[in-house]
Amino acid sequence: MSEIRLIRAINDELYLVEVQATLERKADSLHIGDLKIIKEKNSEKKKATLTVGNQYMEGVVESLKKPLAVLQKTNADPVDVYSSPSHELKCCSIIRERIRFSSRPLPTK
């Protein structure tokens, strides 16, 4: 089962995260794990590590062929009494890269 999530990095850029597993978290917390994105020296490639509990996964950062827009739907007030309520879509961000974790989790060192 493949699970896809959106995360916000330190530089406020959104990434699409693709994991070939199910991630669990405590019911009272939104925190799942720690994600680190590392740019390789002498290269434009980026790698990522995700630590969840006592396991970690290694992944790669890839550019998306087509960027994705993150939209927020809001209810707009009707213009007059006779018009029906309408909805507005606001573009919050553009996702240009994804982080793909395709291997099984490994125990932390």
From Swiss-Prot:
InterPro entries hit by this protein: Ctf8
Any one GO biological process: mitotic sister chromatid cohesion
Entry GO MF terms: ATP hydrolysis activity; DNA binding
Keywords, ordered alphabetically: Cell cycle, DNA replication, DNA-binding, Nucleus
Pfam families cross-referenced by the UniProt entry: Ctf8 (PF09696)
Keyword Cell cycle: yes
Localization (cell): Nucleus
Origin superkingdom: Eukaryota
A GO term from the CC aspect: Ctf18 RFC-like complex
Main location group: nucleus
Xref: PANTHER family: CHROMOSOME TRANSMISSION FIDELITY PROTEIN 8 (PTHR47475:SF2)
Record text on subunit structure and interactions: Component of the ctf18-RFC complex which consists of ctf18, ctf8, dcc1, rfc2, rfc3, rfc4 and rfc5.
Function (record text): Essential for the fidelity of chromosome transmission. Required for the DNA replication block checkpoint. Replication factor C (RFC) complex has an essential but redundant activity in sister chromatid cohesion establishment. An RFC-like complex (ctf18-RFC) is formed where ctf18 replaces rfc1 in the RFC complex along with the association of dcc1 and ctf8. This complex is required for efficient establishment of chromosome cohesion during S-phase. Acts as a PCNA loader, loading PCNA onto primed templates.
Family that this chain belongs to: Belongs to the CTF8 family.
Protein name stated in the entry: Chromosome transmission fidelity protein 8
